[in-house]
Design a protein with these regions (language model features):
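Eukaryotic interaction-scaffold segments
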Residues: 1-5
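Alpha-helical death-domain superfamily interaction modules
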Residues: 6-29, 36-111
Length: 111
């Protein structure tokens, strides 16, 4: 099984970048890597009633992905880091998505 360290190394991203709190603009990009957003939401620590509320309130999958990440960031505040997001992708079995998301995080942090 891949670790966050493995993913960061494969993506060419320093681990200290992943320890940062997720910014809103990068969260919008990371939503693209949440193909199975309900599974990822569970791994991010959202409760079933929170997931159901997002699912019921919004129509499109894209809106649901963004809302789920917004809910996670709101709930976890400074603990909503890129590292935690990559861990959730890995726990959901989304290794390639984790690598691609890590690359996007690295690209955003270099600006």
């Amino acid at each position: 099984m891949f670790s966050v360290e493995d993913v960061a190394a494969e993506a060419g991203v320093e681990l200290d970048v992943l320890s940062r709190e997720c910014s809103q603009d990068v969260l919008l990009k990371l939503a693209n890597f949440c193909n199975h957003w309900t599974l990822i939401a569970r791994h991010l620590g959202l409760e079933e009633h929170e997931i159901t509320a997002v699912d019921d309130d919004l129509k499109t999958t894209d809106e649901k992905r963004v809302a789920m990440l917004d809910k996670w960031k709101e709930k976890c505040a400074f603990r909503a880091t890129y590292h935690v997001f990559i861990e959730a992708l890995l726990a959901a079995g989304r290794t390639q998505g984790a690598v691609e998301a890590c690359k996007a995080i690295g690209a955003a942090s270099s600006h």
